[in-house]
């Protein structure tokens, strides 16, 4: 099974056609939608299903100009690093020896290693957080999470914050490692995310199960 197989199947379903119709209608009204059309499915482009080792769930894309490009928590290289990603880097620096904090927030090199950076809602209207949360994307991304759980073994799922943690019911914990904490946003990072040790625990599990690990330093 590949992403193309999953996408081809889902695109035939009424809910998916409704999503595409909604986006086309909103664009026709002159509304700005992020990420741009060609970047909406970048998480699937950069992390092949066969190579997938880790899933990090976000909620919806960044809603300001030049930020969102289809990967959860990631921004274009020339954009300021968002606060949540700054806290992700802080946890990496705290827990990973010799981690070098990048001067950018472009996470494509994680994605290419098998870190699937999936927002549960794939689009957003400019400057309106969560504006597309009810248009059907979660039906699609819930299916994706479930397909990963059913068709892969020994994947590490990082669920940060209450929204992501609700997706735990879609994952078979007997086949995969589920790591949970508060969200890395400034509002909640100090209530459990900073100090969670997820990146260390992730690599311990991957080494044990697959004799592989993620090079979190590869961004530098």
UniProtKB/Swiss-Prot annotation:
What is this enzyme's catalytic activity, as reactions? Hydrolyzes single-stranded DNA or mismatched double-stranded DNA and polynucleotides, releasing free uracil
Q: Gene3D superfamilies from the xrefs?
A: Uracil-DNA glycosylase-like domain
EC numbers on record: 3.2.2.27
Compartments, record wording: Cytoplasm
Record SMART domains:
UDG, UreE_C
One Pfam family name from the record? UDG
Which Cys pairs does UniProt list as disulfide-bonded? none
State the Gene Ontology terms under molecular function.
Answer: uracil DNA N-glycosylase activity
Please classify the protein's predominant subcellular localization into one broad category: cytoplasm
GO CC terms on record?
Answer: cytoplasm
UniProt keyword list:
Cytoplasm, DNA damage, DNA repair, Hydrolase
Please give the biological process terms from Gene Ontology that the record holds: base-excision repair, AP site formation via deaminated base removal
* Residue numbers annotated as active site: 60
- Decide whether keyword Ligase is in the record: no
The record describes the protein's role as: Excises uracil residues from the DNA which can arise as a result of misincorporation of dUMP residues by DNA polymerase or due to deamination of cytosine.
Q: Report the sequence similarity comment from the record.
A: Belongs to the uracil-DNA glycosylase (UDG) superfamily. UNG family.
Q: Which NCBIfam families match?
A: PRK05254.1-1, PRK05254.1-2, PRK05254.1-4, PRK05254.1-5, ung
Protein name per Swiss-Prot or TrEMBL: Uracil-DNA glycosylase
Organism, as annotated: Francisella tularensis subsp. holarctica (strain LVS)
> Which taxonomic lineage is given here?
Bacteria, Pseudomonadati, Pseudomonadota, Gammaproteobacteria, Thiotrichales
The gene that this protein is the product of is: ung
